[in-house]
A protein has these predicted regions:
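An extracytoplasmic/periplasmic, membrane-proximal ligand-sensing/linker region
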Residues: 7, 24-26, 63-65, 206-207, ...
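Short, low-complexity disordered leader/linker segments with a strong preference
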Residues: 1-63, 355-356
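Hinge/capping helix and adjacent helix->loop/strand transition within the periplasmic-binding protein
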Residues: 116-122, 136-222, 271, 284-317
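Beta->alpha turn/N-cap motifs
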Residues: 126-131, 190, 219-220, 237-242, ...
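A ligand-binding cleft/hinge motif common to bilobed small-molecule-binding domains
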Residues: 130-139, 205-207, 234-268
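N-terminal (or domain-start) structured segment
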Residues: 57-147, 185-187, 209-234, 245, ...
């Protein structure tokens, strides 16, 4: 067996060799620490430069016109909100805000345009709930939700459950009982395939165990006209579009979707209050920018848009449209998107709805 030495019993040449090895190791460790220190210092400097650059960019933002993309036709609710708030933003910042309507493919064309735009805060999207519903409904979407950064939720909306006044039905429970007694005989209208109203109708069918025929329309206007004309036995209609007709003697409103009663209809119960939970998700209108837009610019834009929503005259205009003003920060808006995406996907999957 090799002889074992204590440190003070080693031959001189062994001690010298060990000392040299220790010295080399110490020098190597010092070199590594020095290299690591240089890397960390460089990274810190780069981060500081980046943060400083972003802050300076925000200080000078906006320095040119802002393009506000609306992925739906002119004249609709989204377009009206864009022009209403865009005018105020232009006045407050002294830069033109140009509303650019880019309809097509259920909003995907406009959404994709902004997702792929330069991330400098000068191309902004006013999207709606469909933005988080589309990935669950279509297999091929040209962008990811992660390609867009939330800026501010301007307002939220709800669908109202209508029936003809002549039906004599005064509660959702009565309507469900009638639908169960006549499976497949009653219909419900929506303002389009794969819209929130369509998904709400399918959700009620699943929750209540009823069978109804879906009748889609090209928008809330034609759907409301069909309801008033007695062509539908029931309908989920957007509160903003239905607002001028909520006092009509031709229709009854049984319930409202969303987490709370509508301010204009304090006596109408929510779906949960009417006996059917799971309809708490509201529709919404919200602003987005490309995902890599510097956070100081996102925050500056979000704060300004939220301040505009809080202006009394703007809040009143939104309420008069049947909407509920919100004016959220980017941090408040982001978790809502994740919750809504999961919520709508669960309904689409359960109802086996596909637009492909």
């Amino acid at each position: 067996l090799p002889e074992r030495f204590d440190h003070d019993q080693r031959p001189a040449h062994a001690t010298e060799r060990a000392s040299g090895i220790t010295s080399n190791r110490r020098q190597t460790m010092q070199n590594r620490r020095s290299a690591l220190s240089r890397v960390l210092t460089t990274a810190a400097c780069a981060a500081l430069v980046l943060a400083t650059g972003s802050a300076l960019a925000a200080d000078h933002y906006p320095s040119k016109p802002i393009r506000l993309v609306v992925p739906y036709p002119a004249g609709g609710g989204t377009d009206i909100i864009a022009r209403l708030m865009g005018t105020q933003l232009s006045q407050r910042w002294g830069q033109p805000v140009i509303v650019d309507n880019k309809p097509g493919a259920s909003g995907m064309m406009g959404n994709d345009l902004v997702a792929k735009a330069p991330a400098d805060g000068y191309t902004v999207l006013l999207g709606i709930t469909a933005l988080v519903q589309i990935p669950a409904l279509y297999k091929k979407v040209p962008y990811q939700l992660s390609d867009l950064a939330p800026v501010s939720q301007a307002a939220k909306s709800a669908d109202l459950v209508f029936v003809p006044r002549s039906s004599g039905i005064t509660s959702l429970q009565q309507f469900v009982a009638k639908a169960k007694a006549q499976p497949g005989k009653l219909n419900y209208g929506s303002y389009g395939n794969a819209t929130s109203s369509h998904l709400h109708g399918e959700q009620l069918k699943l929750k209540a165990g009823i069978d109804m025929v879906h009748v889609p329309y090209q928008g809330s206007g034609p759907e409301m006209a069909a309801m008033l004309g007695g062509q539908l036995e029931s309908a989920f209609i957007d509160a903003a579009a239905a607002y001028p007709h909520i006092k009509s003697d031709k229709v009854s409103i049984l319930a409202v979707t969303g987490s709370q009663r509508h301010p204009a209809l304090p006596d109408v119960p929510t779906m949960a209050e009417a006996g059917y939970s799971g309809f708490e998700a509201n529709g919404w209108f919200g602003y987005f920018v490309p995902a890599s837009t510097p956070q100081p610019i996102v925050d500056k834009l979000g704060n300004e848009l939220a301040a505009i929503v809080r202006m009394p005259e703007i809040s009143k205009r939104l309420l008069d449209m049947g909407l509920i003003p919100v004016g959220s920060t980017p941090a408040e808006f982001k978790p809502l998107l994740a919750r809504d995406a999961a919520h709508w996907k669960s309904i689409v999957d359960a109802a086996k709805i596909s637009m492909d």
